[in-house]
Amino acid sequence: MSTDKTNQSWGGRFSEPVDAFVARFTASVTFDQRLYRHDIMGSIAHATMLAKVGVLTDAERDTIVDGLNTIQAEIEAGNFEWRVDLEDVHMNIEARLTDRIGITGKKLHTGRSRNDQVATDIRLWLRDEIDLILSEITRLQKGLLVQAERESDTIMPGFTHLQTAQPVTFGHHMLAWFEMLSRDYERLVDCRKRLNRMPLGSAALAGTTYPIDRELTCKLLGFDVVGGNSLDGVSDRDFAIEFCSAASIAMMHLSRFSEELVLWTSAQFQFIDLPDRFCTGSSIMPQKKNPDVPELVRGKSGRVFGALMGLLTLMKGQPLAYNKDNQEDKEPLFDAADTLRDSLRAFADMIPAIKPRHAIMREAALRGFSTATDLADYLVRRGLPFRDCHEIVGHAVKYGVETGKDLAEMSLEELRQFSNQIEQDVFAVLTLEGSVNARNHVGGTAPEQVRAAVARGQELLAGR
């Protein structure tokens, strides 16, 4: 069975219809139909411009615009029939427009190609998606600031190599994720700036012979600038790759955060409690409360990384200008945007609801000689070289391992066997509070600095 070639806008050159399987294989309407709002937006701007330069009459423009608005309403009401034989979102909408308003509908495509049309649609769509994602990042960051302020004095162990390193505050830890998300936000803002160049008017690849006004169309569609080269305009997908790169970094951050949450909820850590609404159980083990949300976010990072690699591979061998390969740009881009937005939404809902277990985190911070560096710094202030202090404290830690005593649990006599510079005042620096309070500088873990960082973060978010 084959399709009727008269269904195709380009059928005039062909002597036989496209094979039915090939029609399905080459069609993109099953996934690019989500561009319909932006396709209609671009078409309305294009028709408005064509009327201004005299290619369309004002009456024709109005008929086209009314028809397109009606089609959008049909789509949003679920009354639009998407046809695979019409290939894509563009031809489906154009065919329906012609059905509704007659021959005037066939004039809409004057001065443009699907090549610059789809390049415009994707940029418009991604611009809106980035705005939604930025709002979710901000919402998540607000939740992190809530936790950081609430838990600015809550002490927990800080880790390197997943081994106890130094005491930090839970609030300070939350602010580390705030910083990462700020960089993610900035990358996406930069990506949005670069993608906001209008390719419409590039036509198939060389521009058009019609007296188009690209500056008008650019203004109507909210682009910052008109693209400077028609070949590049229809073939450029850097913006999609850049978005997937920024999305991959953001998902990497969320994946790392997820790993910590999974660890912290485990019976081996028990640092935090996740509300039941963010967890699931087991079909066989009645006791289980599984942290599915962070686990899924951790797993979904691979989808976004794959989208980035897929787009890089897609583009690496293409000559100028447009090639059918580019039809494959949409599904990975769509999936990357959906995955990042949904992951951010899940985290933005979950993070403010986390309940730290203060006593357990404090007890964990008391294990592992987390104030060893503080003892070394104490000896430095007594006039000893740091490397000598490092050696001295190393011996003290070895003694603690052998005797089962933390540094703060040793007597002054025991500590002085490693250095006669140690006096009674050493115990003030060996406490958890003494350790975190001593890091009282910008970027440090002292509660005072955590609260100051929260204030700066709130000011940053208020300025967006």
From Swiss-Prot:
It is found in: Cytoplasm. Pfam families: ASL_C2, Lyase_1. Coiled coil: none annotated. One of its GO terms (biological process) is arginine biosynthetic process via ornithine. Its EC number is 4.3.2.1. Keywords: Amino-acid biosynthesis, Arginine biosynthesis, Cytoplasm, Lyase. Pathway: Amino-acid biosynthesis; L-arginine biosynthesis; L-arginine from L-ornithine and carbamoyl phosphate: step 3/3. GO terms for molecular function: argininosuccinate lyase activity. NCBIfam families: argH. HAMAP family: Arg_succ_lyase (MF_00006). This is Argininosuccinate lyase. It comes from Pseudomonas syringae pv. tomato (strain ATCC BAA-871 / DC3000). The lineage of its organism: Bacteria, Pseudomonadati, Pseudomonadota, Gammaproteobacteria, Pseudomonadales. The gene is argH.
